[in-house]
A protein has these predicted regions:
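Mid-chain, well-packed structural core segment of small domains
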Residues: 95-115, 123
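Active-site-proximal, substrate-binding regions of enzyme catalytic domains
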Residues: 1-91, 98, 106-109, 132, ...
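Hydrophobic alpha-helical interaction segments
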Residues: 113-156
Length: 159
């Protein structure tokens, strides 16, 4: 089971590859705050219509709000709720933002990111190359550290 933050879902939707996320994860849980960030924040985010049609993405409420309240305030509401939901469900967390990754790891949650999804997609034969997908994500404003990309591409044989 995987809980997702907003960023990875939206970037896969923006580049028209939301189905790739499904092929790798099977299904995703999102907390209420992530749903709100995607659909209600000053109008829907780009890619929201694709997400709305994705029946494999399930909205779930966090039960123990005290977990959310104890999260660092530098994290966005979606990140805090995603961490709390992953903790409640004993699930992996799909998130790319470094502060959220650290906070989740501090809670004992296994963290995966967009690049891990691409690695798995390549390993399973769903994509041939990760590099053009990463470039497309970057062209849509999604940021990865340059050294992280170079290291990742080396690991997946595209360096």
């Amino acid at each position: 089971m995987i809980v997702s933050d907003t960023g990875p879902i939206v970037v896969f939707a923006r580049i028209g590859r939301l189905s790739l996320l499904r092929e790798v994860t099977g299904a995703l849980l999102i907390p209420d705050a992530v749903h709100t960030e995607i659909f209600a924040k000053k109008g829907a985010m780009p890619g929201a219509s694709e997400v709305a049609q994705a029946t494999w993405i399930q909205r779930v409420s966090v039960v123990d709000r005290s977990i959310v309240d104890r999260m660092p305030k530098v994290l966005h509401g979606g990140e805090r709720e995603a961490i709390a939901l992953a903790k409640e469900r004993g699930a992996q967390l799909l998130v790319d933002e470094i502060r959220a990754r650290r906070a989740a790891s501090d809670q004992g949650i296994e963290v995966i990111g967009t690049l891990r999804v691409l690695d798995e997609a390549k390993r399973l034969g769903h994509i041939g190359l990760a590099r053009p997908i990463i470039a497309h994500m970057q062209s849509q404003g999604y940021r990865f550290e340059r050294t992280l990309i170079l290291s990742f591409l080396e690991i997946v044989g595209e360096g």
